[in-house]
Amino acid sequence: MSENNKAILEAANAAIAQGNYEGFLSFCTDDTEWTFVGDRTLKGKAAVRQWMATEYVEPPLNIVANLIAEGDFVTALGDFTIKDEDGKAAYYSYCDIWRFRGDKMVELRAFVIPAEVKAETSNAA
């Protein structure tokens, strides 16, 4: 079951990367609950859909460093970049803990912190 849950999360993330937010939501239960620790809780697909519409002006760039699965849980560690309406990028590091019910994502506890991007150095004179 754990490997199957990892594959489901990877497929859901691929939908997000393509801007297919409804495709992503098809992997969630109707009563899905997302808790952004220290920020807010979204209850149900409609709330998540509305949040995505405002937060994902364009698909985020998500770099998953690790996926760890055990039982009904998959933990994802990584970094992502989102752009606002003006095209300004914001960078974050995260730890998402997903709980599955059957083959659907039912609960998310997300720990998200702003990250600084190190300036690239150049040898150009």
Describe every region a protein language model picked out:
Residues 18-35:
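Short, well-ordered alpha-helical segments enriched in acidic and aromatic residues
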Residues 1-14, 35, 39-42, 47-125:
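A beta-strand edge to alpha-helix "cap/lid" segment located at domain peripheries
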